[in-house]
Protein backbone atom coordinates (compact mmCIF):
# COMPACT_ATOMS: atom_id res chain seq x y z
CA UNK A 1 0.00 0.00 0.00
CA UNK A 2 1.37 3.38 -1.03
CA UNK A 3 2.05 5.95 1.64
CA UNK A 4 0.26 9.30 1.46
CA UNK A 5 3.17 11.48 2.60
CA UNK A 6 0.92 14.56 2.65
CA UNK A 7 -0.80 13.12 5.72
CA UNK A 8 2.54 13.31 7.55
CA UNK A 9 3.54 16.87 6.62
CA UNK A 10 2.60 19.49 9.21
CA UNK A 11 1.14 22.74 7.88
CA UNK A 12 2.01 25.70 10.11
CA UNK A 13 0.08 28.91 9.41
CA UNK A 14 1.77 32.32 9.55
CA UNK A 15 5.32 30.92 9.73
CA UNK A 16 7.85 32.40 9.20
CA UNK A 17 5.66 35.38 8.24
CA UNK A 18 1.96 36.21 8.36
CA UNK A 19 0.13 34.78 5.37
CA UNK A 20 2.63 31.96 4.79
CA UNK A 21 1.81 28.30 5.35
CA UNK A 22 5.03 26.47 6.22
CA UNK A 23 5.11 22.83 5.11
CA UNK A 24 7.09 21.00 7.80
CA UNK A 25 8.70 17.66 6.87
CA UNK A 26 10.04 16.92 10.35
CA UNK A 27 7.18 14.49 11.17
CA UNK A 28 8.45 12.32 8.28
CA UNK A 29 12.04 12.60 9.47
CA UNK A 30 11.07 11.67 13.03
CA UNK A 31 9.47 8.40 11.93
CA UNK A 32 12.13 5.96 10.74
CA UNK A 33 9.74 3.96 8.56
CA UNK A 34 8.36 7.06 6.85
CA UNK A 35 11.84 8.55 6.37
CA UNK A 36 13.06 5.27 4.88
CA UNK A 37 10.00 5.07 2.59
CA UNK A 38 10.44 8.65 1.36
CA UNK A 39 14.15 8.02 0.81
CA UNK A 40 13.39 4.82 -1.09
CA UNK A 41 10.92 6.57 -3.42
CA UNK A 42 13.42 9.31 -4.24
CA UNK A 43 16.19 6.71 -4.67
CA UNK A 44 14.05 4.73 -7.12
CA UNK A 45 13.46 7.93 -9.07
CA UNK A 46 17.19 8.79 -9.10
CA UNK A 47 18.04 5.24 -10.17
CA UNK A 48 15.52 5.45 -13.03
CA UNK A 49 17.27 8.63 -14.22
CA UNK A 50 20.70 6.94 -14.22
CA UNK A 51 22.10 9.11 -11.43
CA UNK A 52 25.82 8.70 -10.77
CA UNK A 53 25.88 11.25 -7.95
CA UNK A 54 23.34 13.14 -5.83
CA UNK A 55 23.68 16.87 -5.13
CA UNK A 56 21.82 18.48 -2.24
CA UNK A 57 21.71 22.20 -1.42
CA UNK A 58 22.27 23.36 2.15
CA UNK A 59 20.68 22.58 4.51
CA UNK A 60 17.64 20.36 4.09
CA UNK A 61 18.98 19.03 0.79
CA UNK A 62 21.59 17.26 2.92
CA UNK A 63 18.84 15.56 4.96
CA UNK A 64 17.04 14.48 1.80
CA UNK A 65 19.97 13.73 -0.52
CA UNK A 66 22.49 11.92 1.69
CA UNK A 67 20.27 8.91 2.45
CA UNK A 68 19.26 8.69 -1.23
CA UNK A 69 22.92 8.51 -2.26
CA UNK A 70 23.62 5.96 0.49
CA UNK A 71 20.73 3.73 -0.62
CA UNK A 72 22.03 3.81 -4.20
CA UNK A 73 25.67 3.34 -3.22
CA UNK A 74 26.71 6.51 -5.04
CA UNK A 75 28.33 9.74 -3.91
CA UNK A 76 26.74 12.82 -2.40
CA UNK A 77 27.94 16.36 -3.13
CA UNK A 78 26.84 19.26 -0.93
CA UNK A 79 26.03 22.65 -2.45
CA UNK A 80 27.02 24.88 0.46
CA UNK A 81 26.42 28.42 1.58
CA UNK A 82 29.41 30.75 1.06
CA UNK A 83 32.71 30.24 2.89
CA UNK A 84 31.91 26.73 4.19
CA UNK A 85 34.14 24.75 1.81
CA UNK A 86 37.92 24.69 2.32
CA UNK A 87 39.14 24.24 -1.26
CA UNK A 88 38.66 26.07 -4.55
CA UNK A 89 34.95 26.53 -5.32
CA UNK A 90 32.52 27.32 -8.09
CA UNK A 91 29.76 29.77 -7.07
CA UNK A 92 26.26 30.61 -8.28
CA UNK A 93 23.89 33.23 -6.92
CA UNK A 94 20.12 33.13 -6.82
CA UNK A 95 17.33 35.50 -5.89
CA UNK A 96 15.00 35.17 -2.94
CA UNK A 97 11.88 37.13 -2.09
CA UNK A 98 13.95 39.19 0.36
CA UNK A 99 17.32 39.41 -1.38
CA UNK A 100 19.81 36.97 -2.85
CA UNK A 101 21.99 34.09 -1.75
CA UNK A 102 24.96 32.12 -3.06
CA UNK A 103 25.70 28.40 -3.26
CA UNK A 104 29.16 26.91 -3.70
CA UNK A 105 30.60 23.54 -4.64
CA UNK A 106 34.19 22.33 -4.76
CA UNK A 107 35.51 22.67 -8.32
CA UNK A 108 36.41 18.97 -8.39
CA UNK A 109 33.09 17.76 -6.95
CA UNK A 110 31.51 16.77 -10.28
CA UNK A 111 33.28 14.92 -13.08
CA UNK A 112 32.65 16.06 -16.67
CA UNK A 113 29.66 14.20 -18.09
CA UNK A 114 28.61 12.82 -14.71
CA UNK A 115 24.85 12.28 -14.41
CA UNK A 116 23.41 14.17 -11.44
CA UNK A 117 20.07 14.19 -9.64
CA UNK A 118 19.42 17.16 -7.35
CA UNK A 119 17.55 16.31 -4.13
CA UNK A 120 15.94 18.85 -1.80
CA UNK A 121 13.01 19.14 0.57
CA UNK A 122 10.92 21.69 -1.31
CA UNK A 123 10.56 23.39 -4.68
CA UNK A 124 8.78 26.74 -4.57
CA UNK A 125 10.07 29.51 -6.85
CA UNK A 126 12.99 27.26 -7.94
CA UNK A 127 15.73 29.78 -7.13
CA UNK A 128 17.78 27.17 -5.28
CA UNK A 129 17.26 24.67 -8.10
CA UNK A 130 18.47 27.25 -10.64
CA UNK A 131 21.68 27.91 -8.71
CA UNK A 132 22.36 24.24 -8.00
CA UNK A 133 21.79 23.27 -11.64
CA UNK A 134 24.04 26.11 -12.80
CA UNK A 135 26.84 24.95 -10.49
CA UNK A 136 26.62 21.36 -11.73
CA UNK A 137 26.59 22.39 -15.39
CA UNK A 138 29.47 24.84 -14.90
CA UNK A 139 31.48 21.92 -13.51
CA UNK A 140 30.63 19.80 -16.57
CA UNK A 141 27.93 17.62 -15.03
CA UNK A 142 24.61 16.67 -16.61
CA UNK A 143 21.51 17.26 -14.49
CA UNK A 144 19.24 14.32 -15.36
CA UNK A 145 16.55 15.06 -12.78
CA UNK A 146 15.48 16.78 -9.59
CA UNK A 147 13.57 15.19 -6.71
CA UNK A 148 11.71 16.87 -3.87
CA UNK A 149 9.59 15.91 -0.91
CA UNK A 150 7.27 18.87 -1.60
CA UNK A 151 6.39 21.00 -4.62
CA UNK A 152 4.37 24.22 -4.28
CA UNK A 153 2.79 24.24 -7.74
CA UNK A 154 1.24 27.72 -7.53
CA UNK A 155 4.74 29.23 -7.52
CA UNK A 156 5.40 27.67 -10.94
CA UNK A 157 8.97 26.54 -10.29
CA UNK A 158 8.56 23.53 -12.58
CA UNK A 159 7.59 25.77 -15.51
CA UNK A 160 11.07 27.32 -15.46
CA UNK A 161 12.57 23.94 -16.39
CA UNK A 162 10.59 22.55 -19.34
CA UNK A 163 13.42 20.17 -20.28
CA UNK A 164 14.21 18.90 -16.76
CA UNK A 165 12.53 15.83 -15.33
CA UNK A 166 11.18 16.76 -11.88
CA UNK A 167 9.72 14.38 -9.30
CA UNK A 168 7.85 15.33 -6.12
CA UNK A 169 6.43 13.10 -3.39
CA UNK A 170 3.74 15.67 -2.57
CA UNK A 171 2.27 18.60 -4.49
CA UNK A 172 0.42 21.46 -2.86
CA UNK A 173 -1.90 23.57 -5.03
CA UNK A 174 -2.71 26.82 -3.23
CA UNK A 175 -3.11 26.87 0.54
UniProtKB/Swiss-Prot annotation:
Protein name per its UniProtKB record: Adenine phosphoribosyltransferase
Highest rank taxon of the organism: Bacteria
Signal peptide segment: none
Annotated catalysed reactions: AMP + diphosphate = 5-phospho-alpha-D-ribose 1-diphosphate + adenine
Gene: apt
EC id: 2.4.2.7
Source organism: Lactobacillus gasseri (strain ATCC 33323 / DSM 20243 / BCRC 14619 / CIP 102991 / JCM 1131 / KCTC 3163 / NCIMB 11718 / NCTC 13722 / AM63)
Places the protein is found: Cytoplasm
Task performed by this protein: Catalyzes a salvage reaction resulting in the formation of AMP, that is energically less costly than de novo synthesis.
SUPFAM superfamilies in the cross-refs: PRTase-like
Keyword Transferase: yes
One GO CC term, this protein: cytoplasm
Assembly and binders: Homodimer.
Amino acid sequence: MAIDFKEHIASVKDFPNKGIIFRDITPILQDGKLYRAATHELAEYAKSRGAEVIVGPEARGFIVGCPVATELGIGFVPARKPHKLPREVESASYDLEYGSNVLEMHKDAIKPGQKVVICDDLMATAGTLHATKELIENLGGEVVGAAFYIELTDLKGREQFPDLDIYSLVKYHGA
